[in-house]
Amino acid sequence: MANYSTSEFKGGLKIMQDGEPCSIVENEMVKPGKGQAFNRVKIRKLISGKVVEKTFKSGESVEGADVIELELSYLYNDGEFWHFMNNETFEQVPADEKAVGEAEKWLVEQDVCTLTLWEGKPINVQPPNFVELEITETDPGLKGDTAGTGGKPATLSTGAVVRVPLFVQIGEVIKVDTRSGEYVSRVQK
C-alpha cells in the first residue's frame, strides 16, 4: 500500500495506525517559533470508532490503509446481520452489529449506504447524510405552548428519537441529518 507524507494529510484520508485502519478527521499544521514544524492530527479508528489525537513530525510518512469504500443498498436485517447489496453485481454483503453501530437507527430499506471494507470484511457503515423517516410517536403540539422553544421529542419509524418543532404531528414524514441526528424539514408528499 502507498505511503503518505504529512504534507499529503487531509480529512478523509485512510491510514494505518497501531495496526488498525484509521480515517483522518482533522489535520492542523503547526509551525512553532522554535523547533521543527509538526502536524496535529485527529484520527478516527475505523474498527473501534474511537477518535484520538496524534502528532506527526513534518515530513514523516505513514502507511496508507488498504480499505475499500463501496456504495451499497441496504436490504434487510435478519436479527444478527444487516444485509447490503451491490446494485451493479447484485452481490450481497452482510455486516455485523459492530460494523453498523450507531448507523442502525438511520437505515431505511433501499437507501444507499457507504460500507468500508478491510480485508474483505465490513468494518464501518455510513448511512446517507439525509434520510426521510415517518414519525410514529410524539406529543401533540398545543396551541400557545411556546414557553420552551426547544421543540418536542419524536420517535421515528426506525426507533430513533429526534427533537422536532411543535407543529410536527404523528404520521408526517420528516427529513433528518444523520451526521448530527437533527430535524431538517418536513417532507411534502
Swiss-Prot record:
Annotated localization: Cytoplasm
Designated name of the protein: Elongation factor P
NCBIfam families the UniProt entry points to: efp, PRK00529.1
Pfam families linked: EFP, EFP_N, Elong-fact-P_C
Gene encoding the protein: efp
UniProt KW Disulfide bond keyword: no
Paired cysteines (S-S): none
Gene3D superfamilies reported for this sequence: 2.30.30.30, Nucleic acid-binding proteins
Keyword Membrane tagged: no
Function: Involved in peptide bond synthesis. Alleviates ribosome stalling that occurs when 3 or more consecutive Pro residues or the sequence PPG is present in a protein, possibly by augmenting the peptidyl transferase activity of the ribosome. Modification of Lys-34 is required for alleviation.
Database matches in HAMAP family: EF_P
Protein keywords: Cytoplasm, Elongation factor, Hydroxylation, Protein biosynthesis
Associated pathway: Protein biosynthesis; polypeptide chain elongation
Modified positions (N6-(3,6-diaminohexanoyl)-5-hydroxylysine) in chain numbering: K34
Molecular function terms from GO: translation elongation factor activity
InterPro entries the record matches: Elong-fact-P_C, NA-bd_OB-fold, Rib_uL2_dom2, Transl_elong_fac_P/YeiP, Transl_elong_KOW-like, Transl_elong_P/YeiP_cen, Transl_elong_P/YeiP_CS, Transl_elongation_fac_P
Organism expressing this protein natively: Idiomarina loihiensis (strain ATCC BAA-735 / DSM 15497 / L2-TR)
GO CC terms, sorted: cytoplasm
BP-aspect Gene Ontology terms: peptide biosynthetic process
Family membership: Belongs to the elongation factor P family.
